[in-house]
């Protein structure tokens, strides 16, 4: 055969981050065989084309592989009949017909809306030598994209997809270690020398027919898997939807052959193509990796035998098969492109939602930071106020002894003020007494002055009389006896005048001395009064200052005392 199928398991770490596989060793299953069709009768085929090759891979690229339980579940799928009757929203449906035999001989029936169905079974396939009498109905050869499993029927919710039978997320075991080697399917396969004679009859086939027949191979050319796992693409293509049979698996291999190389992301997309959200079938536990490899080798031998039978009968029955499977392959490719577009749009929507949520979270974070900053400022201000109150409280506590000392000093100063007031009253009384004496002395002075004036007048009159007498005496010297008597009177008057003058001078001297004494006493009294007034004013000012300090201390401590005037009156009493 000229055509060769290749599967490339290029795992994407973004979509398959939860995959796991066995760690160290890997198993390589090399199969040199032709194309496979599960629709033909089985014949004997030698086991020369199968071997097992255990070797590690150089660079691991898969994140997760298949566990033994999941692998056996893909090899031995037995579902209940009620779960196999799945209807598609587009009007198409597959139903697997089970038989009572132990071998896997169940075949699907393709249904339409008008309840017409085409059975894909051994009895419905054309027999050898009778390709013109095919049992396919006309409905099986129709190629309608919308009628065959539309995108709306394939798209399930996330919860159902996570429970899907074909999802890679359900295939990995939690306790399985990571993969040590990637899935490395061989790009081409060579035929066994024992098969070269059988392939000579197929050289006359056209390229399109050969590719169509090659697409019927369920297990593709020889490939390499890690120990304890099988290719993810093989498992998903064989079990899309959980209820498709060998014919539908052949269609998936046809699609894979047409595509060339499928990434693990596309395989994960195909694995989600569940028709409904039914739970996965019960898995069977595998004893060891050798059992899994042995079963896989047995299946590959069976498929190789079927491929040889199909090659020998290709000239008889290639026309209906190629038409049907080419249409189905084209449908699957179109649906695969639509699924890619759908999931790309979903990825864009999710990224936009994540960006919006990130922006909202950044805005909330900024608001929270501003609120935190404001609360921190309020906390700092409250702490400052608390420190100020503590300082005031400490000052008030320290001002208690100072207040007591100030009160004691105020009481002392109040006593001194009262004593000075008493002295002031005594001095004022003495001043008043001295003032009375001064007034009396002034009266006496006036009287003395009046008396002196009278005496002066009398002395002036006497002097005039004496002058007149002398003039008369000088004019009349004859009358001597009379003159002697007059002379005696004059002498007497002169003596009296001299006495009066002396008395007057003595009185004036006494008055002057008294005046000087009074003036000195007056000056003393005034000076003493001024000193008392100045000391009183100074004490009054000091008292006012102390009272202000006391009031300030009372206001700082918060105590209420009586007014200073009443307190001073109390101290004086």
From Swiss-Prot:
Pfam families: Fez1. InterPro entries: N4BP3. Residues 186-196 have a biased composition (Low complexity). One of its GO terms (cellular component) is axon. Disruption phenotype: Morpholino knockdown severely impairs cranial nerve development, with shorter or missing cranial ganglia and reduced nerve arborization. Neural crest migration is impaired, although neural crest induction is not significantly affected. Brain size is reduced and cranial cartilage development is severely disrupted, leading to smaller head size. Eyes are smaller and deformed, with coloboma formation and disrupted retinal lamination. In eye, expression of the genes rax, pax6 and otx2 is reduced. In brain, expression of the genes emx1, pax6, otx2, en2 and egr2 is reduced. Transmembrane segments: none annotated. Its main location: cytoplasm. Keywords: Cell projection, Coiled coil, Cytoplasmic vesicle, Developmental protein, Neurogenesis. Signal peptide: none annotated. Residues 287-474 form a coiled coil. Disulfide bonds: none annotated. GO terms for biological process: nervous system development. Residues 125-135 have a biased composition (Basic and acidic residues). It is found in: Cytoplasmic vesicle; Cell projection, Axon; Cell projection, Dendrite. It comes from the Eukaryota. Residues 119-138, 173-220, 384-405 are annotated as: Disordered. Residues 207-220, 392-401 have a biased composition (Polar residues). Plays a role in axon and dendrite arborization during cranial nerve development. Also important for neural crest migration and early development of other anterior structures including eye, brain and cranial cartilage. Belongs to the N4BP3 family. This is NEDD4-binding protein 3-B. The gene is n4bp3-b.
């Amino acid at each position: 055969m000229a055509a060769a199928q290749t599967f490339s398991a290029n795992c994407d770490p973004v979509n398959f981050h939860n995959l796991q596989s066995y760690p160290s060793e890997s198993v390589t299953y090399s199969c040199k065989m032709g194309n496979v069709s599960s629709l033909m009768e089985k014949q004997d085929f030698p086991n020369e084309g199968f071997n097992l090759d255990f070797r590690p891979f150089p660079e691991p690229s898969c994140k997760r592989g298949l566990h033994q339980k999941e692998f056996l579940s893909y090899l031995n799928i037995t579902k209940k009949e009620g779960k196999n009757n799945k209807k598609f929203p587009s009007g198409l449906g597959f139903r697997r017909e089970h038989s009572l035999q132990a071998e896997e001989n169940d075949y699907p029936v393709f249904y339409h809306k008008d309840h017409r169905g085409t059975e894909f079974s051994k009895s419905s396939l054309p027999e050898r030598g009778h390709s013109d009498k095919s049992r396919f109905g006309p409905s099986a050869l129709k190629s309608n994209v919308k009628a065959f499993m539309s995108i709306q029927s394939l798209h399930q919710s996330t919860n159902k997809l996570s429970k899907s039978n074909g999802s890679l997320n359900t295939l990995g075991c939690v306790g399985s270690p990571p993969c040590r080697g990637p899935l490395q399917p061989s790009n081409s396969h060579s035929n066994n020398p024992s098969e070269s004679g059988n392939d000579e009859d197929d050289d006359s086939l056209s390229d399109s027919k050969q590719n169509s027949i090659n697409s019927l191979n369920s297990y593709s050319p020889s490939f390499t898997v890690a120990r304890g796992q099988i290719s993810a693409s093989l498992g998903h293509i064989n079990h899309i939807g959980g209820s498709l049979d060998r014919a539908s698996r052949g269609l998936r291999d046809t699609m894979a052959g047409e595509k060339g190389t499928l990434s693990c992301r596309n395989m994960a997309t195909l694995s989600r193509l569940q028709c409904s959200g039914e739970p996965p079938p019960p898995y069977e536990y595998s004893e060891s990796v050798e059992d899994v490899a042995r079963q896989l080798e047995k299946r590959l031998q069976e498929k190789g035998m079927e491929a040889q039978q199909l090659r020998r009968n290709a000239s008889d029955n290639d026309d209906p098969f190629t038409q049907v499977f080419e249409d189905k392959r084209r449908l699957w490719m179109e649906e695969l492109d639509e699924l890619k577009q759908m999931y790309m749009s979903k990825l864009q929507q999710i990224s936009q939602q994540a960006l919006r949520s990130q922006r909202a979270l950044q805005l909330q974070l900024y608001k929270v930071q501003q609120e935190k900053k404001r609360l921190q400022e309020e906390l700092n201000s409250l702490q400052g106020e608390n420190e100020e109150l503590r300082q005031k409280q400490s000052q008030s506590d320290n001002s208690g002894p100072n207040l007591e000392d100030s009160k004691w000093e105020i009481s002392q100063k109040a006593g001194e003020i009262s004593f000075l007031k008493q002295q002031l009253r005594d001095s004022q009384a003495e001043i008043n007494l001295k003032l009375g004496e001064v007034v009396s002395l002034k009266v006496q002075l006036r009287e003395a002055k009046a008396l002196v004036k009278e005496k002066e007048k009398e002395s002036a009159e006497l002097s005039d009389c004496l002058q007149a007498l002398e003039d008369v005496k000088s004019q009349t010297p004859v009358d001597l006896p009379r003159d002697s008597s007059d002379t005696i009177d004059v002498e007497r008057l002169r003596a009296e005048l001299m006495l009066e003058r002396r008395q007057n001078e003595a009185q004036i001297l006494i008055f002057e001395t008294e005046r000087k004494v009074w003036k000195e006493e007056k000056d003393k009294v005034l000076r003493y009064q001024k000193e008392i007034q100045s000391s009183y004013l100074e004490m009054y000012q000091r008292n006012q200052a102390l009272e202000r300090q006391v009031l300030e201390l009372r206001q700082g401590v918060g105590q209420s005392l009586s007014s200073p005037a009443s307190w001073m009156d109390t101290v004086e009493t």
